Amino acid sequence: IMYIITLKISNMAIISETINGKMIDVVINSSNLKTASFNTETEDLTVTFNNGAIYEYNKVPWNKFTKFRLAESQGKYFNENIARSHKYTKKG
């Protein structure tokens, strides 16, 4: 089952979300971040930056991912709460 959710809320940076099984894909309206994909089973968060770089951040808890998705500034939340506190691997 796949769900596509489109959000148009002025204070939120999410453009759309796709929920497909264990993956949640988020398109982000940010000066630095382009997309984020969260694996609900492994808690890995894969982030694509606007410059094309792709990084996978490990063991990001569901509640932290939810706060990231709903943050007024997803880039700021990401930098302060995910990028600096989770192990990561460069994917591309």
Regions found by a protein language model. Give the residues of each.
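Short, Lys/Arg-enriched N-terminal segments with co-localized hydrophobic residues
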Residues: 1-11
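Acidic/histidine-enriched, beta-strand-rich ligand/metal-binding domains
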Residues: 12-92
